[in-house]
Amino acid sequence: MILRINILGVLCALALINPLSMMGQDKQFTLHDLIPGGKTQSRFVPRNLKQLQWCGDTYLYVKGDSMMSGESTKAVKVAFTRQQLNEALAVVGAQSVGGMPFFSVPYKDQPVLAFNAKHHRFHYDFVENRIVSMYDLNGSWENLDFCPANGYLAFTEEDNLKILSPDNAVSIVTDETAEGVVCGKSVHQNEFGIHKGTFWSPNGSALAFYRMDESMVTDYPFVDITARCAKAEPHKYPMAGMKSHEVTVGVYNLATGKTVWLKTGLPKEKYLTNITWSPDEKSIYIAELNRDQNEMHLVRYSALTGDKEVDLFTEKNEHYVEPQHPVLFLPNNPDQFIWQSRRDGYNHLYLYNTKGEQLKQLTEGEWEVLDILGFDVKGKALFFSSTRPSMLSSFSYGDALYVGTSRLDLKKGTSYELTSGGLQGVHATQLSASGKYLIDSYSAPDVPREISIIDGQKRETLRTLLTAKNPYEGYAMPEIVTGKIKAADGVTNLNFRLVKPVGLDETKKYPTIVYVYGGPHAQLVTGGWKNGVGGWDIYMAQRGYVV
């Protein structure tokens, strides 16, 4: 929900304010400078490295028509150019690309990049400069899901699931014809960490997938406002107190071509979330949540028969339970896994065995684990990002707008931070395949962006890749203030952000715009660049408004 107060008054009053009298010689922004899609907006975004990612322990990024590569102790060099890529495409009879495509890394241990172009998916070995795989795609295919273990590609066409082999043979997994039944797509309104509808087994012998029947759900009259003339696009949306969709999980065996359905039972109106395969491919784990969203069961099913094997444990809360992350098995112990839960009020890590017994709590405190980045090569250490305050700062938990990255010793249960900062700052990190190195993209209210390669064992910067300049230099900038107010319970802290008008005179009253987005998982006040202030807020503050 977005609330803007006195919008008409704001727009009308803009013409009455003399910007030059307020800002002296400092330059002013236009809306084109600050609003996404503006003609000059890209000039005012802190510089970045395009498509920065790991391929093994080599980092890659696009610079112009070249892919640059580097290692922790070696200088950056050109890995390949667009011309070389087009030469490789010509060898297999494919059309050239007019610009560098968007690349992904399909294999952890191979110098191969994947990209889509001209209705094909290509796998390109940039060391040998050759196309090693070429998949023929149809423009109507969606939800592509590649399996590195077998080279197969799952996809949906309309509302059915199919599989494309490395030799471009198509297998039909589902053939649903009833209206309102969809297979292989994301379900449950993309809640509870769900972002796709297919799940390859570790060795690629089977594919688990969602089947959703929403024929009983009422159509809600959404409108597509992106079209030249707005048009109706009805969408199945389960309203409170009305019928919801029914979801089941199928397991397709590539060798037999047959599907086994998991016997998830009654009630049918429940949420099947966070699907995970066991390392031996014999079982599937599902976090099952009731429709009231206050009771979750972690259940294991046989992937061979569909039978329920065991209900491992239950989480209940009078307010809500929200499973967001699948179980994560330890790489060197298939009988133990990590579970994320907010059972103590903050999202933390817990170590379990496959009998459902909690072995230990791995993290604790008045801070949140945000993401698990991966393990080291030996599987003895885990890397995670969190809001835990930097050990270099002297402030208590809950007072910071800080995100850092830590290394956790799984045996000892102790962790330490690899990144560092002050009261505010955000470290967005990527872990290399071996866990030896991390890419650290750091920003703070007064730091546009710094990108470094850091050591995965100790807090040490090995190489700085980028130090971005302040894109607002020379412009009149408002003062940005952050702080906390108490919620209605008088205890809970709520972050706020205040953008003061440029040239503020504290003896005067100013028109004020209150901006609130009350949705879940949407923290607008951050410790990053300018505390997450948007361009429109800055534009209005330059014109005499409190935002």
Predicted regions and their residues:
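Generic hydrophobic alpha-helical membrane-segment signal
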Residues: 1, 236, 285, 336, ...
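Generic alpha-helix initiation/capping and coil-helix boundary signal
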Residues: 6-8, 147, 489
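Short, solvent-exposed coil/turn linker segments
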Residues: 2, 18, 30, 80-84, ...
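Beta-propeller folds
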Residues: 24-428, 436-437, 445-449, 454, ...
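Serine-hydrolase catalytic core recognition
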Residues: 34, 218-219, 281, 420, ...
